[in-house]
């Protein structure tokens, strides 16, 4: 077995555990409130948007778990970002009304690690 295969299985197992933990919480009856995103979360969202302006529901759910945001906040962020880009004319015709794209959780993790490294360099760690 290759080392990379083990990493993928390990990542999928960890993601499964996070999903089970989130399922147990359920939706509350509290009114929706605006979710404040950290600089790190915003950087990750922007990097993922560069790869997939229309991520699949599963990709958004995985991303939400990985960066500790509610799924609804991630869905709304992508919707708003596409709208901003379309208004500014910066979203190509290929991406307007495009099909949803799935991103492998390992690739998402690599994007997050890349942003983390950039953050560390900027903060002088």
From Swiss-Prot:
Keywords, ordered alphabetically: DNA-binding, Homeobox, Nucleus
Instruction: Provide the residue ranges listed under DNA-binding region in this record.
Output: 30-89
Question: Where does the record say this protein resides?
Answer: Nucleus
Membrane-spanning intervals of the chain: none
The record's annotation in SUPFAM superfamilies points to: Homeodomain-like
Return the PROSITE patterns for the record. Answer: HOMEOBOX_2
A GO molecular-function descriptor = DNA binding
GO CC annotations on file: nucleus
Q: In its UniProt entry, what is this protein called? A: Homeobox protein HD-8
């Amino acid at each position: 077995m290759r080392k990379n295969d083990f990493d993928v299985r390990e990542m999928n197992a960890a993601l499964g555990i996070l999903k089970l933990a989130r399922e147990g919480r359920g939706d509350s009856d509290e009114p929706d409130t605006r979710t404040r995103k950290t600089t790190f979360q915003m950087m990750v969202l922007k990097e993922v948007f560069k790869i997939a302006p229309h991520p699949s529901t599963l990709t958004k759910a995985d991303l939400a778990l990985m960066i500790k945001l509610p799924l609804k906040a991630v869905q709304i962020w992508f919707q708003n970002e596409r709208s901003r880009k379309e208004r500014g004319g910066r979203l190509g015709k290929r991406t307007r009304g495009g099909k949803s794209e799935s991103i492998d959780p390992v690739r998402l993790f690599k994007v997050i690690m890349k942003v983390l490294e950039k953050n560390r360099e900027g903060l002088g760690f």
